[in-house]
Curated annotation (Swiss-Prot):
InterPro entries reported in the protein's UniProt record: Class_I_gatase-like, M60-like_N, Pep_M60_3, Peptidase_M60_dom, TCAF
Organism: Bos taurus
Gene that encodes the chain: TCAF1
Keywords: Cell membrane, Membrane, Transport
Protein name: TRPM8 channel-associated factor 1
Superkingdom, natural source: Eukaryota
Function: Positively regulates the plasma membrane cation channel TRPM8 activity. Involved in the recruitment of TRPM8 to the cell surface. Promotes prostate cancer cell migration inhibition in a TRPM8-dependent manner.
Subunit architecture: Interacts with TRPM8 (via N-terminus and C-terminus domains); the interaction inhibits TRPM8 channel activity. Interacts with TRPV6.
Sequence ranges assigned to domain Peptidase M60 in this UniProt record: 542-841
Subcellular locations according to the entry: Cell membrane
Source species taxonomy: Eukaryota, Metazoa, Chordata, Craniata, Vertebrata
Domain notes: The C-terminal region is necessary for the channel activity stimulation.
GO cellular component: plasma membrane
Family of this protein: Belongs to the TCAF family.
Keyword Transport (UniProt): yes
TM annotation in the entry: none
Length: 921
């Protein structure tokens, strides 16, 4: 099939003017999906002629039937018929309603004849948009390879009938909508046209809210909120970007968890996780959704085999289902989770021709497993859903109640907000609803990740954003001059990042002030730099490999590597500050400042609007060995590796390497801090040897091998997403914590509680964690262990919360209120573990963590996990600890208590003393 650009050129070849009949008032056309494109657009941006493809056939739609019998439009009509005919020489059939068209075509040498019915022998069929008897025949004709030229307007038709939902009831739309083109009841302006040399843009917004409000009301009938509080899942946020797509459940930040859409003659509902198909509280909504998708047909409801729980929920509401592994030919509705890209075209045609699709999927796990690959572009679910106007993002949402849109109250939508942003940027005034611009930025950046090449619906948005952002200089966010997120300047930061990463010309994105880390100031090396990168990864997840190079902001670099490495799933990353700040109220830096992409070619170009240290991302279990990677456009940054870098080399680096960020590395930990801080460090060796002792202790308590298979990372940043520090890969901290990381004397005297707390968080395992109770508790076991065994700082001095009088008071308050596991959290929960440690030492913990690592099929709910811990710890110390944990109000099961009764009683149980001396509560 020809590309839209080539098709546009073919349709417009030799067309020099649009001489449309003055008395024929057209209607505006609405274009959706990935195949449709505009041909004639007036000066108000309304599409009046469009084209598309469906199956093996093609479609041209004109917005008034009189255009098809206008002799002055003969050049265009001949082009249209020629482009539509896939079989050269095949005759053109013309419906009797357009009989004059047959004469126009015959007069130009085209074989055309009046045919009351469409026939397979025809190459093209021409008809008006009001025929109600040939709908299915016309769709099948086009799908098999025929060309369809159709014209009409819907505004007059709408005025004459009772049904106001033109998009879904107008006869022409029952045919053209399968290819993504709709007649609307909006009148088209004909006061001025120009013949475009290149394909015009599709407008961002065509008003059709009234057509969708009835659908929304039907889906949400009897439902005031969508509550998934106890669903035990984190759904993906949905990006609702289609003109006929609409959100159904939103959080307080306008994050969407469930959405629906019309597409062609069919319907789609998407949830951000398949687990939502099993949530009892969503039962009424699930019933509404399936009934809406069925569209009154009372047809066959097919449920994918893996989702049989949904079948049970629907049965309670009186809906019978058929459990099948795949879509069946007689299905009316198909409920499934898309796990591969198999059958995407079949499913899209199923919807276009009237089927209902109920999809549940999350993309964050896929994104975690595929760093550097956008789920908007490659996640199997999105290959199916993107044309419908709903995409599944890698951003997760917290489980909770989600509000539903209410009649008469405006609801956030990407397209309507983008249209308002366009108006504000043009006039430099105006406002939108609270929170909408803060949402527009990340939504726009996500939308720009959808591959747009030769897809006019996406290309039009790219062109619009490039035009808007090139008019103004980009704001520069700093701590001294923060940018408010929920305003145009905040939206610009996210949108600019998205544009840069989508391949737009960076010369269009000029900051208000050139900072000292951009390419005009940090002059990249004129000659390429080659670094040897260790591409072995014995770990169970991907890892970053440092290069010691920094990429200035807006600098385009060229990366070269051997042919064999280009097929090894390596990725490149610019920047280490991975925190997503899109929900921050103020921005001290851009909300997203890294860029990743696949190194799937021997030579690749990449840029990052904000600059950053350069990394090669190596997949798990890689055994590629050392790979030479050559970078053109980088500058060197300070990088010290314990055991490799000499003190003389380090002194030279901090004097000569201009990169503004540098790294201190051992085989077990890598610290990323500003170069300005590193210049105060004459000799990093003693500091890093201490850090290695810390990491050895962390590994020892966690029963991990040492040296670690992969080093942990700690990165300082001007702003992070949550807290003072937070765990993850990397651990993130504020700039104020840098001295705590790199001042050896300070570490030895005051300790290292914050960083080790986060290292402990990274050690936590769900098998022996009891969230939310122990989330901020068990990680502190590592703090106590490191401070006492490595730094020689007793627990009571390491943290005031562990001063003995404070600890005793905390236990008495807990018991005084009546011990209850609901109140057993954080420091109170830690006390339970410390009492065991003070009685039995650290060895039982180490042996226990080892045992957990070697076990499989462990329980997943808190009660069973807590009882397993009681049993395993009791066996480790050969004491019956059930009474001890019962004193802490753990939910000890009767059979567990009975099974431990043979063990000796723990006479020294400190909780006995507390209970004996506790005042009655």
């Amino acid at each position: 099939m020809a590309t839209p650009s080539a098709a546009f050129e073919a349709l417009m070849n030799g067309v020099t003017s649009w001489n449309v009949p003055e008395d024929a008032v057209p209607c505006e056309l609405l274009l959706i999906g990935e195949a449709s494109f505009p041909v004639m657009v007036n000066d108000m941006g309304q599409v009046l002629i469009a084209a598309s493809s469906y199956g093996r056939g093609r479609l041209v739609v004109v917005s008034h039937e009189d255009y098809l019998v206008e002799a002055q439009l003969t050049p265009f009509l001949l082009n249209a018929v020629g482009w539509l005919c896939s079989s050269p020489g095949a005759p053109v059939g013309v419906h009797p309603s357009l009989a004059p068209l047959a004469k126009i075509l015959e007069g130009s040498g085209v074989e055309a004849k009046v045919e009351p019915e469409v026939k397979d022998s025809l190459g093209v069929y021409c008809i008006d948009a009001y025929n109600e008897t040939m709908t299915e025949k016309l769709v099948k004709f086009m799908k098999r390879g025929g060309g369809l030229l159709i014209g009409g307007q819907a505004w007059d038709w709408a005025n004459q009938g009772d049904d106001e939902r033109v998009l879904f009831t107008f006869p022409g739309n029952l045919v053209t909508s399968v290819a993504g083109v709709y007649f609307t009841d909006n009148k088209g302006d004909t006061s001025f046209f120009k013949v475009s040399k290149k394909m015009p843009k599709i407008p961002v917004l065509v008003s059709c809210e009234d057509d969708l409000s009835e659908d929304r009301d039907e889906l949400l009938h009897g439902i005031s909120e969508l509550d998934i509080t106890n669903s035990d899942c984190f759904p993906s946020q949905l990006l609702v970007h289609g003109a006929l797509a609409f959100p159904l459940g939103l959080d307080s930040y306008h994050g969407c968890v469930i959405a629906a859409a019309r597409y062609g003659r069919g319907r789609v509902v998407v949830t951000g996780h398949k687990v939502l198909f099993t949530v009892g509280k969503l039962g009424p909504f699930l019933l509404n959704a399936v009934r809406w998708l069925d569209a009154g047909r009372r047809g066959k409801i097919v449920v994918q085999t893996e989702l049989r729980t949904l079948s049970g929920l629907l049965a309670v509401g009186g809906i019978d289902t058929s459990i099948e592994p795949n879509l069946t030919s007689d299905a009316s509705v198909y409920c499934f989770e898309p796990v591969s890209d198999v059958g995407v075209k079949e499913l899209q045609e199923f919807v276009a021709e009237g089927g209902g699709l109920f999809v549940g999927a999350q993309a964050w796990w896929w994104a975690f497993k595929n760093p550097g690959v956008s789920p908007l572009a490659r996640f199997p679910g999105n290959l199916l859903l993107n044309p419908f106007g709903i995409s599944i993002t890698s951003q997760s949402l917290n489980p909770g109640p989600f509000r539903t849109p209410k009649a008469g109250i405006r609801t956030y939508h990407f397209r309507s907000t983008l249209a308002e942003f366009q108006v504000i940027m043009g006039r430099k005034r105006g406002n939108v609803e609270k929170g909408w611009l803060a949402k527009l930025g990340p939504d726009g950046a996500a939308f720009l990740q959808i591959p747009a090449e030769e897809i006019p619906a996406y290309m039009s948005v790219h062109r619009l954003l490039r035009k808007l952002l090139s008019r103004y200089r980009l704001p520069v966010a700093t701590r001294e001059n923060p940018v408010i997120n929920d305003c145009c300047r905040g939206a610009m930061l996210s949108l600019a990042t998205g544009l840069a990463h989508s391949g737009s010309d960076l010369s269009l994105l000029v900051p208000e002030i050139e900072d000292m880390y951009s390419s005009p100031y940090l002059r990249p090396s004129e000659s390429p730099i080659t670094v040897e990168v260790n591409c072995n990864n014995p770990g169970t997840r991907y890892c970053w490999m440092s290069t010691g190079l920094y990429i200035p902001g807006r600098q385009i670099i060229e990366v070269s590597l051997p042919e064999a490495a280009a097929s090894a799933d390596l990725k490149i990353q610019i920047g280490c500050h991975t925190d997503d700040l899109t929900r921050a109220s103020k921005l001290f830096r851009g909300p997203l400042v890294i860029n990743r992409c696949c190194l799937d070619k021997p030579t690749k170009s990449i840029t990052c609007l904000w600059g950053g240290l350069l990394y090669i991302i190596v997949p798990q279990s890689s055994k590629l060995g050392t790979v030479p990677v050559t970078i053109k456009g980088a500058v060197r940054a300070p990088y010290y590796k314990l055991g490799e870098t000499t003190q003389e080399e380090w002194k030279r680096q901090i004097q000569e390497n201009p990169g503004p960020w540098g790294e201190l590395a051992t085989d077990n930990i890598i610290l990323t801090v500003p170069t300005a801080n590193l210049r105060t460090l004459e000799n990093p060796e003693p500091l890093l040897r201490l850090w290695d002792e810390v990491m050895q202790a962390v590994a020892r308590l966690g029963a991990e091998p040492f040296p670690l298979r992969l080093p942990q990372r700690i990165v300082a940043d001007v702003q992070i997403s949550v807290g003072w520090m937070h765990a993850g890969y990397p651990i993130m901290c504020h700039l104020e914590s840098v001295q705590e990381l790199i001042n050896e004397k300070l570490i030895r005297t005051k300790g290292l509680w914050g960083p080790v707390h986060e290292l402990g968080r990274n050690q936590q395992r769900q098998e022996w964690e009891f969230p939310p109770h122990t989330t901020e508790a068990t990680c502190n076991l590592w703090c106590v262990y490191v401070h006492e065994t490595v730094l020689g700082i007793p627990r009571g001095r390491a943290n005031i919360a562990l001063w003995p009088p404070v600890r005793e008071k905390r236990v008495r308050i807990y018991l005084g209120k009546g011990p209850n596991v609901k109140n057993w959290n954080a420091w109170t929960a830690l006390e339970t573990y410390l009492q065991l440690q003070e009685a039995f030492g650290w060895e039982p913990f180490i042996r226990l963590f080892t045992e957990y690592r070697n076990q499989t099929n462990l329980p997943t709910d808190n009660v069973d996990k807590m009882n397993l811990w009681v049993k395993m710890f009791s066996h480790q110390v050969q004491k019956n600890l059930a009474p001890f944990f019962e004193a802490w109000a753990w939910p000890i099961q009767k059979e567990v208590a009975t099974s431990l009764a043979y063990l000796p009683e723990w006479e020294e149980n400190i909780m006995k003393l507390y209970l004996l001396t506790q005042m009655p509560h």
